[in-house]
Amino acid sequence: LLGTAQTPGNGEELRLYQRDNEFSIKAGRHELMNSRIYGSEDALAKLACQKISARPQARVLIGGLGMGYTVRTALDELGPKAQVIVAELVPAVVDWNREFLAELAGRPIDDQRVKVHEVDVAQMIKIPDGGYDAIMLDVDNGPEGLTLKRNDWLYSLKGLSTACDALRP
């Protein structure tokens, strides 16, 4: 066990584990992510960024930092003037990415194109005229609130409509 953190809003404990070269983050008895398996994170970023990679100043929002794999793939897909904004609800996850997890994805949050906000991604989506070219939601391992019930809103018709309004044409 490398670290623990409380999830804002419900107080559920997140735990960061390491075994040999493998890391995992768990909430309760659920494994949220593991450094062995990150294909879905890569696929999410590739799918979103390939369609906008030709835009010289693409601006994307990623909900959930995780272990940094989505951010790394977005950076690899986008140009040198792109902006990658990350909303991470749990400050300790950001700290873990600076310390224990930094090398897993090649220190993506140290890239000058990245700005990390320790905030609920829903708040970032609700900002009028967010001006994002893509929004990637990688929270709660899917469309049902696993760590936070309020995350159900993100994948509701209202949440998706709000996200759509935050996109550039």
Regions from the language model: what does each represent?
Residues 38-169:
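The AdoMet/dcAdoMet-binding core of the Class I SAM-like
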Residues 1-56, 76:
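Rossmann-like AdoMet
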